[in-house]
Amino acid sequence: MSEFRIHHDVNELLSLLRVHGGDGAEVYIDLLQKNRTPYVTTTVSAHSAKVKIAEFSRTPEDFLKKYDELKSKNTRNLDPLVYLLSKLTEDKETLQYLQQNAKERAELAAAAVGSSTTSINVPAAASKISMQELEELRKQLGSVATGSTLQQSLELKRKMLRDKQNKKNSGQHLPIFPAWVYERPALIGDFLIGAGISTDTALPIGTLPLASQESAVVEDLLYVLVGVDGRYVSAQPLAGRQSRTFLVDPNLDLSIRELVHRILPVAASYSAVTRFIEEKSSFEYGQVNHALAAAMRTLVKEHLILVSQLEQLHRQGLLSLQKLWFYIQPAMRTMDILASLATSVDKGECLGGSTLSLLHDRSFSYTGDSQAQELCLYLTKAASAPYFEVLEKWIYRGIIHDPYSEFMVEEHELRKERIQEDYNDKYWDQRYTIVQQQIPSFLQKMADKILSTGKYLNVVRECGHDVTCPVAKEIIYTLKERAYVEQIEKAFNYASKVLLDFLMEEKELVAHLRSIKRYFLMDQGDFFVHFMDLAEEELRKPVEDITPPRLEALLELALRMSTANTDPFKDDLKIDLMPHDLITQLLRVLAIETKQEKAMAHADPTELALSGLEAFSFDYIVKWPLSLIINRKALTRYQMLFRHMFYCKHVERQLCSVWISNKTAKQHSLHSAQWFAGAFTLRQRMLNFVQNIQYYMMFEVMEPTWHILEKNLKSASNIDDVLGHHTGFLDTCLKDCMLTNPELLKVFSKLMSVCVMFTNCMQKFTQSMKLDGELGGQTLEHSTVLGLPAGAEERARKELARKHLAEHADTVQLVSGFEATINKFDKNFSAHLLDLLARLSIYSTSDCEHGMASVISRLDFNGFYTERLERLSAERSQKATPQVPVLRGPPAPAPRVAVTAQ
């Protein structure tokens, strides 16, 4: 069951149970996906579950009758459902809830029906009729009504099937039989009610001698066996789809009548098979049913040949009723099996693969009865021929030609170009899908391989290459599944190799992935340094003020100036300015179908004033068929990783620029050195934090994971393995870089914001000092003009500059509270960093994320933050404990306090 089907079923179940609020569908979906186990049906387990439900039910007969009815229709997954229901009978609490829910729903339904119900008055009969007239009228009406109703239902069913198949095959409509085919019942070959073999009045059979009675009845039976009413034996009108019944003259001798009743089931079976053949020969029922009907028609012809031979014996006076009963024995068994199959196909409304499943299961059920099994094998082999033709085209050439929608693989109209444009497009998953109802039971285990085989070849065909499997052989049905299993395995291996070689060698998949790694994961630093030097000024602007063509030009220049110039795919790299920041993008991806996503769907994107640095990202042009692997989902993951690292790189550059500009502070007087030292220390702590985080992400997460990906790609045997390895690589990088945990990402984002605000503050202060220094320089130049000696000039320059800077620093301290500002930055940064370390510690122990433990040891390599956290916890515990004076004796040792994150 696909993920989308699970989502749909869980949501529908919650709606039926009227469950609102709570944990939400996602929790139950996750539980179902983690605890899925295949249910293996056995006769014992199915019978035990059935017996348990029957014992629990108030009406066990009705339940068993319904179970047998569904079983006769070959209903899929019936036994797993019965097993689940038997388990529910053991859970009293769940049963009570379901009963209460059913009662409430019934009351609501009754209230809805009651409001729209109107009374109907039945007029009294105008005159009276006798019982005999009433019986005759009932028979006439029943005959007309049943025939017309049955014909209307068949016509309606054909129309529904035709409309459904025309909708799926919009370019090719099914042909239609002319109306006279259905208007002339004599063409069907079944009984015509009310039409006898002669218009002569039949003699009362009770007046005839026993030998004459037997001869007349034999002649009647020969007619009845080919679908024609006799004088003394006639067919009754059908009541729906029930078996044909016959009316035998009651005046017939009892012994003869008993033998007649033994032979009549053959005629009833013939009638059922004939109707089935005529009905399933319509175009709407598909090629499998056509082939089955044709095989049955061949057997019916043999039956007619037998009847004609018996008629010849009868004309020679050599056929008695006893001989007829003897000769008809083999045909009785054959016609009974054919009628049983026809009835089961009708009840189950089987088409295509479901018909083959029924025939296959019936063949197995006749194990031990060689003649019956041989008959079923003949029918199954004939019916499977058109299905295997479609299968061969699919697994040998990647083509689906299924005009009647019978095949297990269904094609959907999707444009392959959208896989690069739309995040939610599922070309690889949804272009071709499995139709569970059309999987023959003998191909159930191979369904996924059959789907993948055709998909692989189809991708190569979409690229303009004609492929034909060199190991192609005709597939013929057999009870030994190994025969066609081996053939499907060979086709799968060939298709896997063809597509894998096509992507790896001709389309250079690995080279494209390396190119993406170079840009999105910052594999080579010189390109990034060049680009940031060129574009940083432009990226500082608000998004609305940025000119994308200018950024594209700067990107092109950076590519040509760096080692990226040797990359053959550098022209596929593009600029993308996202409409929201990284956290919002992450929540949109993680919170699909949740309250958070619904709330954000109504948010105005213009409310967030993003800078170019926050909105900037790369994009990559991927062409078909590489877009199967590097699709929009994968590119979105790459973009999130890039934006995360890009902003870290930007913060690092800002902190380094503060370090460069702070060299001027060495000239400060001792009066200002103390609080300048605090700012420098904080800057170094911030720089240490950012650089260690970057080192962890690039060298402890991405590089090892990338090497694992390259190793896995070399050993991959098919494209699904490649897709799985690539997706696993991205998911691992996102998880270990803290991008799948919104709580960690929010704390990390706050830390980055504190660093950026600190650098802005320091840069403003440095620019102010630089401006005052320039003013001091101008004053010194004025003094030089007055004629001071050269040595004195140099000493005066340094002294004057130091004096101006010290005075400015003291002024800033007094006016703007610079020291208090630095202390506030220090406090906020330390608080957020301690919060991050505490959360990382929790996740590393609870979720066994050992990589996060590496982050902790890297950020707190000397125990500095652990000591601060312990000291903070001790202070809080002392404030919470009341102070009790101690009169004498040494002070008691302080208790050890557990460190907790606040």
From Swiss-Prot:
<keyword id="KW-0225">Disease variant</keyword>
<protein>
    <recommendedName>
        <fullName>Gamma-tubulin complex component 2</fullName>
    </recommendedName>
</protein>
<dbReference type="GO" id="GO:0065003">
    <property type="term" value="P:protein-containing complex assembly"/>
</dbReference>
<keyword id="KW-0963">Cytoplasm</keyword>
<dbReference type="InterPro" id="IPR040457">
    <property type="entry name" value="GCP_C"/>
</dbReference>
<dbReference type="GO" id="GO:0043015">
    <property type="term" value="F:gamma-tubulin binding"/>
</dbReference>
<dbReference type="GO" id="GO:0036064">
    <property type="term" value="C:ciliary basal body"/>
</dbReference>
<comment type="subunit">
    <text>Component of the gamma-tubulin ring complex (gTuRC) consisting of TUBGCP2, TUBGCP3, TUBGCP4, TUBGCP5 and TUBGCP6 and gamma-tubulin TUBG1 or TUBG2. TUBGCP2, TUBGCP3, TUBGCP4, TUBGCP5 and TUBGCP6 assemble in a 5:5:2:1:1 stoichiometry; each is associated with a gamma-tubulin, thereby arranging 14 gamma-tubulins in a helical manner. Gamma-tubulin at the first position is blocked by TUBGCP3 at the last position, allowing 13 protafilaments to grow into a microtubule.</text>
</comment>
<dbReference type="GO" id="GO:0001764">
    <property type="term" value="P:neuron migration"/>
</dbReference>
<keyword id="KW-0206">Cytoskeleton</keyword>
<dbReference type="GO" id="GO:0005815">
    <property type="term" value="C:microtubule organizing center"/>
</dbReference>
<dbReference type="GO" id="GO:0016020">
    <property type="term" value="C:membrane"/>
</dbReference>
<dbReference type="GO" id="GO:0051321">
    <property type="term" value="P:meiotic cell cycle"/>
</dbReference>
<dbReference type="GO" id="GO:0000278">
    <property type="term" value="P:mitotic cell cycle"/>
</dbReference>
<dbReference type="GO" id="GO:0007420">
    <property type="term" value="P:brain development"/>
</dbReference>
<dbReference type="InterPro" id="IPR042241">
    <property type="entry name" value="GCP_C_sf"/>
</dbReference>
<keyword id="KW-0451">Lissencephaly</keyword>
<keyword id="KW-0991">Intellectual disability</keyword>
<dbReference type="InterPro" id="IPR007259">
    <property type="entry name" value="GCP"/>
</dbReference>
<dbReference type="GO" id="GO:0007020">
    <property type="term" value="P:microtubule nucleation"/>
</dbReference>
<dbReference type="Pfam" id="PF17681">
    <property type="entry name" value="GCP_N_terminal"/>
</dbReference>
<feature type="modified residue" description="Phosphotyrosine">
    <location>
        <position position="83"/>
    </location>
</feature>
<dbReference type="GO" id="GO:0005654">
    <property type="term" value="C:nucleoplasm"/>
</dbReference>
<keyword id="KW-0887">Epilepsy</keyword>
<dbReference type="GO" id="GO:0000922">
    <property type="term" value="C:spindle pole"/>
</dbReference>
<keyword id="KW-0597">Phosphoprotein</keyword>
<dbReference type="GO" id="GO:0005813">
    <property type="term" value="C:centrosome"/>
</dbReference>
<dbReference type="GO" id="GO:0051225">
    <property type="term" value="P:spindle assembly"/>
</dbReference>
<comment type="similarity">
    <text>Belongs to the TUBGCP family.</text>
</comment>
<keyword id="KW-0493">Microtubule</keyword>
<dbReference type="GO" id="GO:0005829">
    <property type="term" value="C:cytosol"/>
</dbReference>
<dbReference type="Pfam" id="PF04130">
    <property type="entry name" value="GCP_C_terminal"/>
</dbReference>
<comment type="function">
    <text>Component of the gamma-tubulin ring complex (gTuRC) which mediates microtubule nucleation. The gTuRC regulates the minus-end nucleation of alpha-beta tubulin heterodimers that grow into microtubule protafilaments, a critical step in centrosome duplication and spindle formation. Plays a role in neuronal migration.</text>
</comment>
<dbReference type="GO" id="GO:0005881">
    <property type="term" value="C:cytoplasmic microtubule"/>
</dbReference>
<dbReference type="GO" id="GO:0031122">
    <property type="term" value="P:cytoplasmic microtubule organization"/>
</dbReference>
<dbReference type="GO" id="GO:0000930">
    <property type="term" value="C:gamma-tubulin complex"/>
</dbReference>
<feature type="region of interest" description="Disordered">
    <location>
        <begin position="874"/>
        <end position="902"/>
    </location>
</feature>
<dbReference type="InterPro" id="IPR041470">
    <property type="entry name" value="GCP_N"/>
</dbReference>
